[in-house]
Curated annotation (Swiss-Prot):
Residue ranges of every copy of the F-box domain listed in the record: 9-55
Ranges of the Kelch repeats in the UniProt entry: 150-196, 334-381
Cross-referenced InterPro entries: F-box-assoc_dom_typ1, F-box-assoc_interact_dom, F-box-like_dom_sf, F-box_dom, SCF_F-box_component
Keyword Repeat carried by entry: yes
SMART domains, per the entry: FBOX (SM00256)
Organism per entry: Arabidopsis thaliana
Stated name of the protein: F-box/kelch-repeat protein At3g16580
GO cellular component term, pick one: vacuole
Keyword Membrane in record: no
Disulphide bridges, residue numbers: none
Length: 382
């Protein structure tokens, strides 16, 4: 009988599971996708946040200078690597004007369109800007109950640049659709009250934006753009706000995959506060979101997390640590680690030559970039 050659994963049946995990943690992420169907155990492993975080090629921040893009790994030491967008037909030197990190993918604003990108998998797709759009600015990604991805952006009306439109790209139809940015719960235009210094946050398929009421004391809250109905409604109040738009740090993020976190640093006192929503966020309107203070750091000589160009810091929370990326007063990028009411460590990123790089948080994932596919017309039933 001829010898039947075994497939690579068949040899793994006799290996200890810990050794299999160690081997897979060294496999390039784009190759892991092919192994998801090997077994339920392997598929569950690739969904495990601990496995992703411990992978040898995991990184948590993206930095962009005028000419290059970099990834920044944190544990066990800081490692900086150059990245490329790899978009066919795109000029290799073109760097995104803006990146939006949301739902384990990155959205890159380019000169004539947007790029949906998973830099960990080295997957990307190009989406043309709408023909009627000028000065388009992306705010986030969502997906509806049919699994279709949607990109949310604001743009100027071509016939009147003083008016802004909410425009939505649907991956199912590969088309942009414009709508008035009206808060359906209050009948008000929301575009002028969006806190534009930070982008949107994607959670459970919907997009959440920080807005405010212009009263004697600014009142901050979240609005929800529902990806299925495309309605815009007030979702909940935030636990705090800021009266110093330019200098205070004020950044919303997703916490533990199913809640919100909010970082605030007062420019005057340098005190840092982290608030998180106490319970999981569901897809129903929940005006009674309860916020709790997760961390407070008020020790002397804390760094100013808002740089000289008034750019907001990037951050994530892990194992009760707050990890922040921001630039100092000279324009050099630094990584700060906070915990137990103190600054634990700070490291300057010397590999990035250019001053004042832009920076974003990134959540590594094996989520493939959705491809635009036009829906075929349904067949007539006779």
């Amino acid at each position: 009988m001829a010898h039947e050659e075994k497939r690579p994963w068949e040899f793994s049946l006799s290996l200890p599971w810990e050794l299999i995990e160690e081997i897979l943690s060294r496999v390039p992420p784009e190759s892991l996708l092919r192994f998801k169907t090997v077994s339920k155990q392997w598929n569950a492993l690739f969904r495990d946040k601990t496995f992703i975080n411990n992978h040898k090629m995991t990184f948590r921040f993206i930095l962009a200078t005028k000419s290059k893009i970099y990834s920044v790994s944190i544990d066990p030491k800081i490692v900086v690597r150059e990245l490329t967008l790899d978009i066919p037909g795109l000029e290799s030197h073109e760097i995104p004007k803006k990146l939006v990190d949301c739902d384990k993918l990155l959205l890159c604003d380019m000169e004539k369109g947007v790029v949906l990108w998973n830099p960990w998998l080295r997957h990307s797709t190009w989406i043309d800007q709408g023909s009627n759009h000028t000065r388009m600015e992306s705010y986030g990604i969502g997906y509806n109950n049919k699994g279709s991805y949607k990109i949310f952006a604001f743009c100027d009306r071509k016939e009147n640049h003083t008016q802004r439109l909410l425009t939505i790209h649907d991956s199912a139809s590969d088309a942009w659709k414009d709508r008035e940015p009206i808060d359906n719960s209050q009948g008000k235009q929301i575009v002028h009250n969006i806190y534009t210094k930070i982008s949107g946050v994607s959670l459970n398929g919907n997009l959440y934006l920080v807005t405010y009421f212009e009263t004697t004391d600014l009142v901050y809250h979240l609005i929800e753009i529902n990806s299925s109905s495309e309605s815009v409604v007030k979702f909940c109040d935030l636990p705090c706000g800021t009266s110093n738009f330019l200098k205070d740090a004020f950044v919303l993020r997703v916490f533990e995959g199913d809640r919100f976190s909010l970082l605030k640093q007062c420019h005057a006192t340098k005190k840092i506060e982290i608030w998180v929503s106490k319970y999981k966020i569901n897809n129903n309107l929940d005006r009674d979101v309860e916020w709790i203070k997760f961390m407070e750091v008020s020790s002397p000589n804390l760094p100013d997390l808002v740089d000289g160009f008034d750019s907001q810091p990037s951050y994530f929370i892990e194992d009760k640590r707050l990890v922040v990326c921001s630039c100092n007063e000279t324009g050099r990028a630094w990584i700060y680690v906070f915990g137990e009411n103190k600054l634990i460590s700070k490291t300057q990123i010397d590999s990035v030559v250019d001053l004042w790089p832009s920076h974003w948080t990134f959540i590594p994932s094996l989520v493939p970039v959705p491809r635009a596919q036009r829906e075929e017309p349904a067949e007539l039933q006779v």
